[in-house]
Amino acid sequence: MVLIEFLTGFFYLYGKRLFSISKVMDMICLDYYTIIPAPLAMMLAARLKNYDLMKRLHEWEISVDYALLVVDDVPSIDFCLSLGAKSPTRAQKRELLRDNTFNPVYKYLMNCSGFPTKREKNIPCDVQCERLQKNIIKELVFNCSVLLEMVLHTEREYAYALHCAAKHNQLPILMYCWQQSTDAESILLKTCCSDKNINCFNYCILYGGAQNLDAAMVEAAKHDARMLINYCVMLGGRSLNEAKETAAMFGHIECAQHCFKLQSYVMDTLNVDETD
């Protein structure tokens, strides 16, 4: 786990990828037995359709059977069969799900690749997978893991990961998801303001630029986040009238009064500056 955390810091540096996720997997799997269980290494390689890595793992006597748990396209299945893969037994599945550390990853990979377990067949597949996705994303974000990218595929998933990263102040993941999400600014503002999280708010202003100050003030007013409104004013935000009206609309009377006082203060300050 230490190496995974070490790689995480280098994988996301100032929001730029230094090397591909396949390269990260190669680096992890060079010493897989001390870091992640062998079945997970094979399953993740299969999920990425990294056939070279799958072949290498197979040569290291890691069972390719596990790959069949997470592939559903003909080329990948054919490749697994060419390496002698057989359908994993129930015992193998149970063994994976007993691993407390990686259980959410196994469960996500197996259940959201077209192979729902018998116990969960009564739950609609889309509902089941959405729950699993949220659980695994939340856990991987919290641990700032390089494995996160392997379970993010849709705009909705990136948005949820961004939301979790903001809540937990996970800057590397926040930077990565910011680049992938088309609605990053709106998601961040809502998360930061509802939690009254100044650190998250700083990230939003930092990556969104000063043009976000006005939108940030209005969003903060919706959540009665007066501290964040003060912060925006200090940085040069001047949409206090809109913030005041928004606060009143959402029933935050004290916040609306606060905006009115700030508005008077800002106007007085500007008048003094003009006089000087």
Swiss-Prot record:
**What exactly does this protein do?**
Plays a role in virus cell tropism, and may be required for efficient virus replication in macrophages.
Family assignment?
Answer: Belongs to the asfivirus MGF 360 family.
| Listed name of the protein | Protein MGF 360-15R
Query: What organism, scientifically named, is this protein from?
Result: African swine fever virus (isolate Warthog/Namibia/Wart80/1980)
Lineage at the top is: Viruses, Varidnaviria, Bamfordvirae, Nucleocytoviricota, Pokkesviricetes
